[in-house]
């Protein structure tokens, strides 16, 4: 076996470089300003309980489409992921294509919200926002962009209110919750959801956050902090890293009854595929989703595997069904440079062709 060639001079230089980088990194961390997220100008135009509906300012020189676009985000994280910084903003990209963008901010549920159900979210909050947009813009239908769990909510809404949805875009949205390789679904199959909700009321956001991180423990809880050392001497990269950390750990609690129903009816019983889920006395049926659909999924998504999203195709009755595969992960589809160049313009183009 060939002996390892250790040169003291090179080793000493590497140690000096490493120490210098750590020192510069500590200075950058100490000097980092407050980490701004949600950078695009917006105005709160409607509120109900914890919910706030925001309208984003149309850029100068851009004429907005007549049909407004409502973004329905997931409950489990904060929606500023879609507008996390100036050069990594799904919102900004959509505005540039002429979309009149509105976004639902669900806020931070507390114990007063523990009895909220899926019916409250779908037939209550989302429907109220859609009615507000229809009245404000004097239209009969809106475009909807649903993100992750918000995509599942949007499918439920389009199933129950097909007359109010002109076009539907779903991003990294679970449809078949029991596809092979779905680690999150496999993990939750044997969890006693009733016991968890009955014991805690609302489900702590921190608990869910650590559950998601545990699906890729090495890369998400260890390796990224080791890799961070290599960027500490770059102030811009430090701020980018801190923005992502802020978002990852900004996890609202989940309204207990909604969590119970969504987890049991969809993760455990696969409600979109097997049926049997009723809201407001009407059954959720994807065959009622007859508007044009653009279904976008990420090829390296560990939370919503591609097959879980692609299952929408055979189950919906969309007049036009289009798929877009993105070569990245669950978060990269919003924040990567490639996504800014490919995904957001594709959404805008698809919507504009059907305006």
Curated annotation (Swiss-Prot):
It catalyses: (3R)-3-hydroxybutanoyl-CoA + [(3R)-hydroxybutanoate](n) = [(3R)-hydroxybutanoate](n+1) + CoA. Poly(3-hydroxyalkanoic acids) (PHA), of which PHB is among the most common compounds, are prokaryotic intracellular storage compounds with potential uses as a renewable, biodegradable thermoplastic. GO terms for cellular component: cytoplasm. It comes from Thiocystis violacea. This is Poly(3-hydroxyalkanoate) polymerase subunit PhaC. InterPro entries: AB_hydrolase_1, AB_hydrolase_fold, PHA/PHB_synthase, PHA_synth_III_C. Gene3D superfamilies: alpha/beta hydrolase. Its EC number is 2.3.1.-. One of its GO terms (molecular function) is acyltransferase activity. GO terms for biological process: poly-hydroxybutyrate biosynthetic process. Polymerizes D(-)-3-hydroxybutyryl-CoA to create PHB which consists of thousands of hydroxybutyrate molecules linked end to end. PHB serves as an intracellular energy reserve material when cells grow under conditions of nutrient limitation. The keyword Lipid metabolism does not apply. The active site is at residue 148. Forms a heterodimer with PhaE, which may multimerize in the presence of 3-hydroxybutyryl-CoA. It is found in: Cytoplasm. Keywords: Acyltransferase, Cytoplasm, PHB biosynthesis, Transferase. It holds the Pfam family Abhydrolase_1. Transmembrane segments: none annotated. It is an enzyme of class 2 (transferase).
